[in-house]
Amino acid sequence: EKFIEEFGKPFELPNGILNKEIPGCGATTVALTDEHKTIICSPRNELLKNKHEQYPDTLLVIGGVDTKEIEAYLQTAELPKILVSYDSVYKLIGCIKYKSDWRVVVDEFQCLLADSSFKSEIELHFLDNSRSFPYVTFLSATPILDKYLEQIDHFKDMNYYQLDWEEKDIVRVYRERTKNPINAALEIVRYYQNGNYPSVYVNGERIYS
């Protein structure tokens, strides 16, 4: 695995779009451990819960958490770090007075563009709320066409950054057509259990999955 810490110096998340290129490289860990008051937004509640377990001094804001809990946390936390779902960001707006003191990190922001599990009004409200904060990092490890971003008012003039890794593991995905995906998946598992691993040749070397 590749981690941002490998760059050898403290990493500063930028104000704008950051294409990590590699998932799980430690960008949200930077946000949780740096010296800034930070709001980390994610569309995945389970991911937020996992991060909260790893960093118990954070505040987890998802459904069921009200503004009183947020205000109580802000009054006592020395360096507040808030983990929040996309659809709960609005709860923070009235509780945080000096928004210029804060940084916002939006993880998996490509979900705002393509995830059909989000209603359009949730996406629009989230983007409107994010405008309240002057420093926002939009994170993604998914290739996003620049032309596509340029068609969206919120992103078209935003600074765009990309991490440049010296070495990257190339993942090749093979699609299998089947009328019964469950049986096909079970068959693939059986192949692995029996030691029959798929392989490809790269630069003359056979590499197994």
Model-inferred region functions:
Residues G26, N45-L48, D87-I93, F109-F118, ...:
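Short acidic, S/G/P-rich loop/turn micro-motifs used as interaction or catalytic elements
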Residues E1-P14:
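Pre-Walker A adenine-sensing motif
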Residues P14-L18, K37-I39, P80-K81, R103, ...:
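Residue-level preference for the first positions of well-ordered beta-strands
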Residues P143-Y192:
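Interdomain hinge/linker at the junction between the two RecA-like core domains of SF2 helicases
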Residues Y86-S88, C95-T137:
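SF2 helicase catalytic motif II
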Residues Y55-C95:
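Inter-Walker segment of RecA-like/P-loop motor cores
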Residues K37-K51, L83-S85, A185-S209:
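Conserved strand-helix element at the start of the C-terminal RecA-like helicase core
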